[in-house]
Amino acid sequence: MSQGPPTGESSEPEAKVLHTKRLYRAVVEAVHRLDLILCNKTAYQEVFKPENISLRNKLRELCVKLMFLHPVDYGRKAEELLWRKVYYEVIQLIKTNKKHIHSRSTLECAYRTHLVAGIGFYQHLLLYIQSHYQLELQCCIDWTHVTDPLIGCKKPVSASGKEMDWAQMACHRCLVYLGDLSRYQNELAGVDTELLAERFYYQALSVAPQIGMPFNQLGTLAGSKYYNVEAMYCYLRCIQSEVSFEGAYGNLKRLYDKAAKMYHQLKKCETRKLSPGKKRCKDIKRLLVNFMYLQSLLQPKSSSVDSELTSLCQSVLEDFNLCLFYLPSSPNLSLASEDEEEYESGYAFLPDLLIFQMVIICLMCVHSLERAGSKQYSAAIAFTLALFSHLVNHVNIRLQAELEEGENPVPAFQSDGTDEPESKEPVEKEEEPDPEPPPVTPQVGEGRKSRKFSRLSCLRRRRHPPKVGDDSDLSEGFESDSSHDSARASEGSDSGSDKSLEGGGTAFDAETDSEMNSQESRSDLEDMEEEEGTRSPTLEPPRGRSEAPDSLNGPLGPSEASIASNLQAMSTQMFQTKRCFRLAPTFSNLLLQPTTNPHTSASHRPCVNGDVDKPSEPASEEGSESEGSESSGRSCRNERSIQEKLQVLMAEGLLPAVKVFLDWLRTNPDLIIVCAQSSQSLWNRLSVLLNLLPAAGELQESGLALCPEVQDLLEGCELPDLPSSLLLPEDMALRNLPPLRAAHRRFNFDTDRPLLSTLEESVVRICCIRSFGHFIARLQGSILQFNPEVGIFVSIAQSEQESLLQQAQAQFRMAQEEARRNRLMRDMAQLRLQLEVSQLEGSLQQPKAQSAMSPYLVPDTQALCHHLPVIRQLATSGRFIVIIPRTVIDGLDLLKKEHPGARDGIRYLEAEFKKGNRYIRCQKEVGKSFERHKLKRQDADAWTLYKILDSCKQLTLAQGAGEEDPSGMVTIITGLPLDNPSVLSGPMQAALQAAAHASVDIKNVLDFYKQWKEIG
């Protein structure tokens, strides 16, 4: 601050130079006075005194005048002083002394006001800069300066080019400051501005995409969510930006150190029997922690043992494949258990955005290793291609589940043992060489997730969705005492480091993050992988990466052949070892019943599968590849319309990740050629996906209302190279990413792009993916071939068929085989669930419990309204399956307006159903029940009991179909007093007698709970 102002140019008026000097001296004096205040030990008590607030306001006015009077020489310096002295240093002072500041105290209120005032000031400054320099930022930010409609044109601007550049970057920095202030607000109790802060940072990136600072701030904002994977993505994006931020390197290193600590702690943890939801969360945690640790090993300067790296790659791939089977019952809802405080909270499925970020992390890792010439480049390529293969497989599974929905409807809740006897043997013996668990059950659960609980959802009052928690026993915030001088001054912002505080308590009750700015996975059935020999999907290596190679089919040089040899050895270890995979079905809340329709595979169009050598005899089940997704959706009996297909494709959130990865592969054709034979599984799955997507001709003939740009794109959709390109959201999000720089050369990010609807974006995505299919079909090695007569893509093995007729016949046989496999897997899922139920029943066969406890509990409306905590304990004990009939839900609906207990019950049931808790299930009505309309008017309680009894008879009849006596299997737990039945009404007494005749017990919920506790 001791230095004087820069000498003004001779052409400047002398009065302006003198005015600038006076302003600068006034700024220096105000800064000096503020520094003296901050040096006191009790500065946090004085900083919000009126005289100090006035001093900061004076400094703010002086800085604004200075930056607009002489923006080129003083603008950046004035911005920095304004931010640091008026806002940031006050914020850091309060955060440092948070232990002295109590919740709802005068100081905390003043601090909140300070943040709000800062947001208001920078929003005003942002608008003023745009207005003063007539900047056109409509495509970048929300709060834009709108041209005066009375003038009808822009005002002339007499600013130089340097001044315009400063104004543009000043807007960028204002948005970063707004994001920081919103992030600080988010740390306060009772304030949720995380999404607002995130939006400001992304708008800053839109204004200046070459600056990496906002990504560092986004990493700090992410905190420990998803065990730091999201933060790792942001820090890597910052580091790989054109103008990176030095603080991101330290932040990333701390994440890697933390990942190593968590990884070794997880390895030491003894395995204990967990509930299905907790086991599911444990699998997700293991995947994300191992993925983080793997990325720390796949660094240019990392020294890791090859055996450890290979083993870790295998573990991550297995867990990735397993966890992709975990699907949410409702979008954007975390399935972490809320009522078991003794366990850590967790995540029960992988969001599409997180999977997208994991794929991009792999691409950034490959890019950095290649640029550094690291020996681990081969391992990174092998791992990335294998991970993408799993991703494509699961996209196929999910698309087929939606496209084939309706062929095998799910029956009502049943628990009978009517499985076909021949389906039991494969459960015991089946060994499949491919690592994917059977994908069939998700087809049923996922296909109905949008309407499974629609009735219960409509009973609730509108509420804000719950905030996904990011707590973890190993995810505490970072501690760092880094200096905030030189590094911050260069960027004009604090470098992050503020940690996301947990809500509750005081406003300052958590540490800061960085001072550098199936409903279950547990399974008693395991698929053991066999040695595959030559059929193993090993990946061979690429040569050194060439972003824009002149020759697509050129030979490998000596050094490239050495890399190929290394990668082949690595991939052989990674994909040929014998591994164990757990069955991971995603059950709906209705028990699955095996399908008896033998014609589900009938098709009038060929169905593409990756392996045509697979015979259709049952004996081949042992040796066939478990490519659960590799049967095309075109094998459906009822062919879906184009509109229906597009609705399914629009809803599939993994397609953007597939599209981006294929863009990267398109710029690395040598990698595709080298890996063509060894990664056959990937190309098989890709051929399935290509055939699931509608062709350009189908889209053009469908009469869809598409904008001219998309219609032009459709004209070249079936060509290897798209003649035109349209920007998609995923392309904008990855702007300036080095691994995709070659792929993005065909885009013009600076021109106005047409606003595409979700449907049009989906069509553009389809065009890009199908064009890639034609692109690799022309490459050397015949990786894929396109058969124009049938309109399908076929892989190498399929193209070896002698004739088109034989090829089509092989496709039909594979469709039939796939349908048989699907039925078998449904049978396996049914048997597995029955095994769990039998184990649950067996756990009750204690001397006292045998005659007293029932495995199935059916609460009535009164029990849920008045004794919800008791119901929660019974449901979470793991000893009972709680059945909720439709009648009970209707009763809660009637009472919700006047009874708060009914509203609590509705919220609880909705949350449990969305979690997929297997111990509490909703039961649909089957068949026609006897309607007692007169009784409904006379005695509503008796009528309700009869309706519940009708539902219970389904369970007792199902049990009676077997050899065991169904008596004592089902108990209705009611909130009504049953101590003296004689005082009950006549219809109620008759209902109790009917229950006894139906082998259904009826007990008061408190009496049942007391009896259960006594038995222990």
From Swiss-Prot:
Modification type N-acetylserine: residues: 2
UniProt-listed GO biological process terms: mRNA export from nucleus; nuclear-transcribed mRNA catabolic process, nonsense-mediated decay; regulation of dephosphorylation; regulation of telomere maintenance; regulation of telomere maintenance via telomerase
PINc domain ranges (all copies): 872-995
Disordered as annotated region, ranges: 408-561, 594-637
Stored Pfam families: EST1, EST1_DNA_bind, PIN_4
Broad class of the protein's primary localization: cytoplasm
SMART domains referenced in this protein's UniProt entry, alphabetically: PINc
Entry keywords, A to Z: Acetylation, Coiled coil, Cytoplasm, Nonsense-mediated mRNA decay, Nucleus, Phosphoprotein
Quaternary structure, from the entry: Interacts with TERT, PPP2CA and SMG1. Part of a complex that contains SMG1, SMG5, SMG7, PPP2CA, a short isoform of UPF3A (isoform UPF3AS, but not isoform UPF3AL) and phosphorylated UPF1. Not detected in complexes that contain unphosphorylated UPF1.
Name of this chain's protein: Nonsense-mediated mRNA decay factor SMG5
Gene: SMG5
